[in-house]
Amino acid sequence: VPRRRIGFAYRFAAVICKPPLVVLLKRDWRGMENIPAEGGFITAVNHNSHIDPFAYAHFQYNTGRVPRFLAKSGLFNKGFVGAMMRGTGQIPVYRESTDALSAFRAAIDAVERGECVAFYPEGTLTRDPDGWPMTGKTGAARVALQTRCPVVPVAQWGANEVLPPYAGRPRLFPRKTHRVLAGPPVDLDRFYGREMTPELLKEATEVIMAAITRHLEEIRGEKAPAVPYDPQRERVEQRRKTRVQAQTRRKGYGGRSVRGPAEHGPSERRQSAHGVPADGAQAGPQYQEGRHQERQNEQRRAGKRAAAREEGLNT
């Protein structure tokens, strides 16, 4: 692809970014032949480090087809960074506003102009504990079905070893290897010409994410979980646990019955710190013995007090 199509701003950004990337990361790049030489297309890439957009852009820059990333709109207002984002043709994503659909329209326009739009279908850094791709959002599938452009699934691994997701400090040494595998375009033919329902978009997205995950398995030499991490499912589960804990505390404060954890089974009961059954169940032998000992101690103390009073009266 002629350099004039890359543009001055992208070439200037490459001059700044490539030297530190070359120093930090060795390269194991495969599948460049699957990047289309002409025409608009989408790359769908997994996201596991704050620096992997730069590492991945380095890979695709070397193919001659530079990516246009969808990025948070706030980055476009940050001085030099914002100027570079605008100059290199990145696409702002406005969230929770009337402009939320503008990124979708801009992505379609870019593809129809013959450019590459790079999607991180997960929408954010993976939260999977082992770094596997999460469930994806439907933006890439929506643009692909609207334009019928090729979708190239890309897996990457290595930038996360320099700067793990949600980590505070980078791990610069020893030098890590950035591994990239770009696969052949995903076959989405069976989705064309059908009504673009949420169910259809979800199914197409699952096909794209499955292709990314297969390539990452090949890179890592490991098997991914059978069910991908689902942030929405985890949020629902966390809210459920929070509600249960809040209800348990309220019942405990009000003197009402408190059931133990469900996994203990209906026949088992949780006891308080003093050994009192929390749900009104029949007291066990340990609790009864403790109460008996307490009554005996109280009787001894009462006897001593009475003896002391009698001694005082007789003095």
Regions found by a protein language model. Give the residues of each.
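Short gly/ser/thr-rich secondary-structure transition/capping motifs
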Residues: V22-W29, A100-L101, V162-P164
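Catalytic core of membrane glycerolipid acyltransferases/transacylases, capturing the structured
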Residues: V22, P36-S97
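Short hydrophobic helices that act as membrane-entry/anchoring signals
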Residues: I6-L25, G82, R86
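Long, low-complexity, intrinsically disordered segments
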Residues: E268-T315
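Catalytic-site beta-strand/loop segments enriched in glycine and acidic/polar residues
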Residues: I108-A140
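A cross-family acyltransferase "interaction/gating" segment
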Residues: D130-E199, E203, A226-S257
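Hydrophobic/aromatic ligand-binding patch that stacks against planar heteroaromatic rings
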Residues: F59, M84, D109, R142-Q146
